[in-house]
Amino acid sequence: MSDQPYDLAPLALLRQQSWLSPAFPTGSYSYSHGIEWAVEAGHIHGRESLEDWLEADLRYGSGRNEAIFFVEAWRSATEDDCEKLLEVAELAAAFRGTSEFVLESSQQATACLATLRRVWPDRVVENLSKLLSERTVPPALAVVLGASAAGQRVPCGLALPAFLQSYAANLVTAAVRLIPLGQTDGQLAIAELEQAVLAASAQAEHATIRDLGSAAFMVDLASALHETQYTRLFRS
């Protein structure tokens, strides 16, 4: 790592925006994280029920765990601790409750890592890629982006909420197509989730691997049941 201070320099901000943009080629538009089944089953049927579902995911479910993985990857990259970074990556890869979540995580992260190496190569990204390849560990998006944020000297307190907001916004976009919702209702849902994003970020910043866990069983169940859903637009 360089000895540059951690701040949100304009160049780092531009890169962070690019990585979290819907235009970044991770294929995130193909995944609904179980929301497609939840809509089909009637658990999500409008903006308010969508907000409730996603807030629970962010505070108690996979969104919370992804935030912790992001923070731990950021810390490990900041400290140049390759063994810790590999441990985080291995745990993140294993911490998938369904086969569709494995697919969703590994395919997006693989595409993200390949693009970062080609467009914004740096030592952190190369080291992470080498570690994962040597140990045949599939990448997880939160780990890739957390480590990359550290490599660009972006403070975790700014990078993490941006990551979680992107996580929620991608799922809102899927729900807009599935329920369906109007575009304005989609933006209202994203706005309503801002406090949940900030709360989840604040919690995760003080958490460690020991705090991983989920109390949002319906999210995992939705993903498992989506695997056998007859008519599907999304891959998860």
Q: Where do the language-model regions lie?
A:
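Glycine/small-residue-rich interface belts in oligomeric ring/scaffold proteins
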Residues: 7, 11-80
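Secondary-structure capping and boundary motifs in well-ordered enzyme cores
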Residues: 9, 23-26, 62, 101-105, ...
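A short glycine/serine-rich beta->alpha loop
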Residues: 14-24, 54-60, 94-101, 129-135, ...
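Internal, conserved structured core segments that host functional sites
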Residues: 67, 72, 76-149
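A contiguous pocket-lining binding segment that forms or flanks enzyme active sites
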Residues: 130, 134-182, 186
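C-terminal auxiliary extensions adjacent to catalytic cores
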Residues: 166-236
